[in-house]
A protein has these predicted regions:
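Alpha-helical scaffolds flanking conserved acidic
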Residues: 98, 134-137
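DPxDG-like acidic metal-binding loop motif
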Residues: 110-134
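ATP-binding N-lobe of GHMP and related small-molecule kinases
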Residues: 1-108, 130
């Protein structure tokens, strides 16, 4: 099974930065601007576990400059999957491979954290054939 979803970014014109917290979910910017087509594309594959294999989630994050190997960036996607797990929406007899493609730079006011979380949740809802809107999870 596989599902792909994307969410455009946002060019912020007026903003205030909130980076004091250690929690990535409490960081970011707030302001006004306009939406752009470039953003985040997320593809999720769900593969049945082999004999003796345990439930796992593998996250790969790619930018225009190459792969990102930063746990802080990956935590956003871990938080989304944990929310789905808490609500018992994931089949733990499957292994999940998540490929995230960031089309705009991080921490530059393009709304990439929100676009990433939303595209990931949309892809999971599609994969799981949920009728719930991703923003309701």
């Amino acid at each position: 099974m596989q599902a792909t979803a994307r969410c455009g970014g946002h060019v912020t014109l007026l903003f205030s930065i909130h980076s004091e917290s250690e929690d990535p979910l409490q960081q970011g910017s707030r302001g006004a601007g306009f939406c752009v087509e470039a953003g985040v594309e997320c593809t999720i594959q769900a593969i049945p576990l082999s004999e003796g294999e345990e439930f796992s989630v593998n996250i790969g994050i790619q930018t225009t400059d190459g792969p990102i190997d930063d746990e802080t960036v990956a935590l956003l996607y871990v938080d989304v999957i944990e929310e789905f797990m808490q609500r018992k929406l994931l089949d733990e007899n499957l292994c999940y491979h998540i490929d995230v493609t960031l089309e705009l730079p991080l921490s530059q006011g393009f709304g990439m954290s929100a676009a990433g979380a939303l595209s990931y949740a949309k892809a999971l809802c599609s994969l799981l054939e949920l009728e719930t809107e991703p923003t309701q999870i």
